[in-house]
Design a protein with these regions (language model features):
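Flavin-dependent oxidoreductases
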Residues: 129-218, 222-232, 241, 250, ...
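Helical element adjacent to the flavin cofactor pocket in flavoenzyme catalytic cores
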Residues: 92-149
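Low-complexity, small/polar and acidic-rich linker and loop segments
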Residues: 407-434
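C-terminal catalytic lobe of FAD-dependent flavoproteins
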Residues: 108, 198, 202, 211-212, ...
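Short beta-strand to alpha-helix junction loop
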Residues: 9, 16-19, 44-53, 92-111, ...
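Dinucleotide-binding Rossmann-like beta1-alpha1 core, especially the glycine-rich loop
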Residues: 1-80, 89, 204-205
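Short cysteine clusters
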Residues: 352-354, 389, 394
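Iron-sulfur (Fe-S) cluster-binding segments and ferredoxin-like electron-carrier domains
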Residues: 358-369, 392-410
Length: 435
């Protein structure tokens, strides 16, 4: 979700960068061919007592520069979203809010960076850092890296990473949020991002369409230790019950996946951006809880400005390679499909039937500037496994393609993170039956 920016307190970095980031995101998604839809959002008042809070959010948003907001009556709200609860008394309409494919958004920008000379080291954990003359030395697997500046964007670990060089003056509170993803049969239940009035735990449980046509519902907010992304029955029940206050008719029997993420909440209600006098050249970008995704491009501008002030950035590259085209086979016309298959026959072989993802799209994901090398890596780049069966049909074929294209032993192929091997052993080794 790309939030409009009415929730952060006026005058905070979060408020300023949220509004700026959403405007930049629209430009970036158009330039880099990222799935994006400016559908707008509604914050509901579900009883008369919540109506003053809508006015408060409207005043916040006005101070923050959020465009086009309007407080709607009950009748206006239900006219826009007829499946909402009959208890709705009104809503705050924010037309600048949008939905985006978050993995594609991040990967597209990373691909452009790599294309223009950035060296990307994956699964490369920083285990120590020390200040040296003119910069820092980072300890990583297999050696060290010396650099003039460090940008600490380590998410839920940002305070611990900062503490490698100086005691951190902020504390990250890892907070888990659980979600339901529902089948496309539920994708038209609402047309806009639906919020309830926010509380001390955050923006609350939302109901929203996705750019792929599904319905997403969540999250809750539960402090956890580290990166605990497990789902709980109590957490999912809370999400379900709370969401039905907004949209009672959601059919959770159409859920195709539940999942959780951990956001980097802070002990202060703002982003941490910048250097400390005790650690010059060490730039923290920390506490990027919601609206972190919304603000991300504007946060990057802040980091660039700091690097420019330190004189570590040269002139803009004359041969900078911008732009991106992502082929989505199912969205092509019949003529375009025929021409593409004639040129590249792999696009004529459908691997994921739920989402109509072709072998050609998977091969593109395996050989991009930031190539996939896991089942979920392919899923996030190409969409294979995103559908109703969640990879039950196409998963084995995707594994075969990874093995064939990247030369990885099938037993070494991961679902996602280290230790998530899909296969544990061979059967009928040497052609002899175990039976």
């Amino acid at each position: 979700i790309l939030h409009a920016g009415y929730d952060p307190a006026p005058g905070t970095r979060m408020a300023r960068l949220n509004v700026r980031g959403v405007a930049l995101a629209k430009e970036i998604c158009a330039k880099l061919d990222v799935s994006y839809k400016q559908c707008g959002s509604l914050v509901l008042a579900l009883d008369e007592k919540e109506l003053p809070h809508l006015q408060h959010l409207f005043e916040n948003g006005t101070a923050n520069g959020v465009p086009g907001m309007k407080i709607l009556s009950r009748e206006e709200t239900l006219a826009m979203e007829p499946n909402l609860s009959e208890k709705v008394c009104g809503a705050l309409w924010a037309p600048s809010a949008a939905i985006v494919n978050p993995w594609e958004y991040a990967l597209a920008m990373t691909e452009v960076a790599v294309r223009n000379g950035v060296e990307l080291r994956r699964s490369c954990k920083v285990t120590d850092a020390e200040a040296i003359e003119g910069g820092y030395r980072l300890t990583v697997p297999g050696g060290t890296v010396e650099t003039r500046c460090v940008i600490n964007a380590a998410g839920i670990w940002a305070d611990k990473v900062h503490s490698m060089v100086e005691p951190a003056n902020f504390r990250i509170i890892p907070t888990r949020g659980e979600y339901y993803l529902l089948d496309k049969s539920e994708g038209t239940r609402v047309s806009h991002v639906i919020f309830q009035c926010p509380n001390e735990l955050g923006k609350g449980v939302l109901v929203a369409p996705t750019v792929h046509g599904n319905l997403i519902v969540g999250p809750n907010a539960e402090p956890v230790e580290g990166n605990d992304t497990s789902c709980t029955s109590s957490g999912l029940e809370f999400v379900k019950t709370t969401a039905q206050r907004s949209v009672p008719s959601i059919n959770f029997g159409e859920s195709i996946r539940s999942f959780a993420g951990v956001r980097a909440n802070l002990d202060v209600d703002d982003f941490v951006i910048g250097e400390e006098p005790e650690a010059p050249g060490w730039i923290d970008l920390a506490g990027m809880k919601s609206p972190g995704l919304s603000a991300a491009p504007a946060v990057a501008e802040e980091a660039v400005a700091i690097l420019q002030q330190r004189g570590v950035l040269g002139a803009e590259k004359a041969d900078y390679k911008d732009g991106r085209r992502h082929i989505r086979f199912k969205e092509l016309s019949a003529e375009e499909k025929a021409a593409l298959v004639k040129e590249q026959p792999a696009y004529g072989r459908v691997i994921c039937r739920c989402e109509t993802i072709t072998e050609g799209e998977i091969l593109a994901a395996l050989h991009s500037e930031v190539p996939a090398n896991t089942i979920d890596g392919v899923k996030r780049r190409a969409g294979a496994g995103m559908g109703r069966c969640q990879g039950g049909f196409c998963g084995p074929r995707v594994l075969e393609l990874i093995s064939r294209e990247l030369g990885i032993d099938p037993l070494d192929i991961l679902q996602d993170k280290n230790g998530s091997n899909v296969l544990v052993s061979e059967t009928k080794v040497g052609g002899k039956s175990n039976g």
